[in-house]
């Protein structure tokens, strides 16, 4: 209710609206809540892929906002100037993490080597399994000529009646019991090799995430500051967008208890059906009685005054 604070909020909305008219708006939707992640970084914990991507999103949004709105002196220029640039960290995260489900081969030379070995092992095991699929001896035993996986192991679908004739380890069976999924003895070692490489890959990914977390931990204050500023800017520009959408005007505030609304429109009623009203109160008289028949607009008028007053106190422009 402090008029100085209200006018500052209205200035911010006005300046954001001016920037929107000049250059359009910025998408703040990638501003993720990183406060819990920053708290974990402060105690030396490692972040997961999703948390690191959220940090990258904050840094990308910061850069986009600063690049998009050129320097100009107004009520929000200070916030824009206080956004901290941490490009190196953002570049490192983007280099290592492709998506929430994938770490880049470029994240480390060790990871690239492990994945290359894993690819070679996969090619070898598929080659061995294809030999069995095309073998006249084993084709009779197979329910279908496909390679499948069960419990992370490559298997072949074998007819249940031939399980004794097909050397290997049973991992699963079909719902009817007519098909057994058997890991052929010839590929057990290759399956073991792949599993070992998968464990090495997972361990290397943990090392990469831990390293990125250490680097992010060096910028906890900047990250938290950027998050708080971007949230504030998001709110300010949302107010400006609403003002633009409603064709709203900046209210002139006073401390004298005077209300003088001209062609005020209830903000929640459809624009093509709302009936504008004029309300004047506080100078010649301080009490206003509204009378009229049912559905004549008495309640809507009272609510319009209340809502427009609250909007103005919140730094919003009003539809009037």
Which positions does each model-derived feature cover?
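Alpha-helical coupling/stalk and coiled-coil linker elements that connect catalytic or binding modules
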Residues: 1-25, 41-46, 50, 63, ...
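Short, charged, amphipathic alpha-helical segments
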Residues: 52-56, 80
